[in-house]
Amino acid sequence: MRRTRTRTRHGVGHLSTIAQSHSWTVMEDHKEITQQLEGDLCLPGDRLRSCKSPIIEFYEEILSLAFGLTCQSVSPQMWQLLGVLYEVFQHDCFDYFTDMMPLLHNYVTVDTDMLLSNPKHLEVIYSMCKKVLTIDAGEDAECHAAKLLEVIILQCRGRGIDQCIPLFVEVVLERLMRGVKSSELRTMCLQVAIAALYYNPALLIHTLDNMHFQHNPQPITAHFINQWMNDTEFFLG
C-alpha cells in the first residue's frame, strides 16, 4: 500500500510538472500526447475517491491539468473523471469547489451535447452547487455555485431543461432568504432567477408562485422583484 501511494504521489507530481511546462496549443496538435495525459490523469484521479489518501495534496494540480485537457473538447475519459470528482466532493472536500469551477464550467460549455445526453451529468453538477449553497461553505464558493447554475441555464436555453429551472431557482432564492452579507453573492443569486426569466418567463413566474419558505410570509415573486430593483446598481452586465 505504501509503495502504491508513493508511486501515485510521484505520478501526480510528474503530471503537475507537465501541466506547468507544456503548451496546451502544442498538445492539441499531438492527440497522442493528450490521450496519454488523460490516461495518466485518470489513474491517480481514481485514487482521489478516498480523501484520506495523500494524493489529495495534489488536488489543485490534477484539476488544473484536467481543465487544460477539456478546453477544446471533453473526451469520454474526462467525463468519467466528473464522477470521481463528485465522490471526492461528497467526502467533505468541498473546500476545493472553487478550484473545481473552471473544469465544471468546461463540462457545461465545451460539450453541452454530452452534458445533456446523460441526466446523471447535470444531476451531479447541480448536487454539488446545491450543497455549497446549503451548507456554510463561504460566500466565495457560493458565488461560484450560483454562477455555474446561471451558466447552465443560459447555455441550455431551448435544450429541454425545463425540469431543472424550479430546482435551480429554489436553491438560490432559499439562500437569498437566509440573509446575504455581500452584494456579490446577492447579485449572483438574483442572476440565476433572471437567467430563468430569460429562459422561459412563464415557467419562472409559475415556479415563484408555487414556492413557499418558512418564516417568510411575503410572496416570493414580490420579494424577488423588490430585491432585483434594490440591487440594480450592482449588476455589471
Each language-model region and where it sits:
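Karyopherin-beta/Importin-beta family HEAT-repeat alpha-solenoid scaffold
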Residues: 1-3, 7-237
